[in-house]
């Protein structure tokens, strides 16, 4: 594997840690055509960011995500920030020709999602939205039943996903 892909991550809290671990472990699970390189970690608190970078193996840190996206040596921008920040970051990354790995939910509303999609489609880049529950057995079964027409025409869908960590009233509700 000779090709290397330089990654910049924006966000070093919970999802940033989860994504960093994923990038580090990917080669242990998949045959990759390129090696992910943990190049730059972006965040607001430089003291925390330095600890994060040291812990997960990021080469550099920055508190200026826009300038990092604009760098020529960055191939992929991993957006692991709260949802209300995704719109501006995705559009900026697409505008600068970066491939995008974005945490869910993608956008706050349909209008934001459509403008983000338009930016990605006009940029010759790939946007990957992290749908990590798509392999859950219940989701796979529901998709199969819909695809096979077993549920008829679907006009509306409302679902919930029961997380056991929500059963603990002392569990923190923030995901950052």
PLM segments and residue spans:
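Predominantly a Rossmann-like dinucleotide-binding segment in NAD(P)-dependent oxidoreductases
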Residues: 125, 133-176
């Amino acid at each position: 594997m000779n090709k290397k892909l330089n990654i910049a991550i924006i966000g070093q809290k919970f999802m940033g840690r989860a994504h960093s671990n994923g990038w580090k472990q990917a080669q242990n699970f998949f045959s990759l055509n390129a090696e992910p390189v943990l190049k730059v970690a972006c965040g607001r608190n430089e003291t925390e960011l330095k600890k994060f970078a040291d812990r997960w193996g990021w080469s550099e840190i920055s508190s200026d995500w826009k300038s990092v996206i604009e760098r020529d040596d960055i191939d992929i921008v991993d957006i692991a920030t709260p949802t209300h920040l995704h719109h501006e970051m995705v559009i900026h990354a697409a505008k600068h020709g970066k491939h995008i790995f974005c945490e869910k939910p993608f956008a706050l509303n349909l209008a934001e999602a459509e403008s983000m999609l338009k930016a990605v489609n006009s940029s010759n880049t790939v946007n990957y939205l992290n749908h990590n529950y798509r392999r859950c057995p219940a989701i796979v079964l529901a998709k199969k039943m819909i695809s096979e027409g077993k549920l008829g025409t679907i006009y509306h869908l409302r679902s919930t996903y029961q997380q056991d960590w929500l059963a603990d009233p002392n569990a923190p509700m923030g995901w950052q």
